[in-house]
């Protein structure tokens, strides 16, 4: 049914976003649903303060770790839902195609870097007041340095995001190219509109 398909796409897009902007704080997850079950469980994307901490980050490796991921307190956080989905061949096949589709056509540097720059331009005039009032960041030059690092990470991310996908799904270059052709077909079917 169409609604279930949309829900599955949203859940995949959630995981794609967590991976693309490597947000290793996957221990803090929240989900919601309606009490009448007209809307089934959906992930809530929030608390992304660990995102973009490294352009090389591999969050998929944590979500698909059947042993569990060690928490700071020594306990293991289990990602049973995602491990179960990963073991489903149909889900994995569509996830790979969707991942390439989203990262190639929407989370690419032609789109993200201008968006990032516009966000920086929006808050830049307020930074001196921010620093004067709160003392954080410690100086304007420190803030500019951090912005430069974030931009560099964002610019380098496409290459590493591809490598993470290939590693976690054991994809050769030839297999990746096959999935990329399917992603291109998906883009053409959607008329270049994100769906």
Where does each model-flagged region fall?
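Residues immediately flanking
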Residues: 1, 14, 48
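Single conserved hydrophobic/aromatic residue that forms the stacking wall/gate
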Residues: 1-9
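Residue-level detector of short, conserved catalytic/binding motifs and their immediate flanks
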Residues: 18, 29, 41-42
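Catalytic-loop signature of eukaryotic-like protein kinases
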Residues: 23-35
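C-terminal catalytic region of ATP-dependent kinase domains
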Residues: 37-173
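Surface beta-strand/loop "capping" patches
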Residues: 168-195
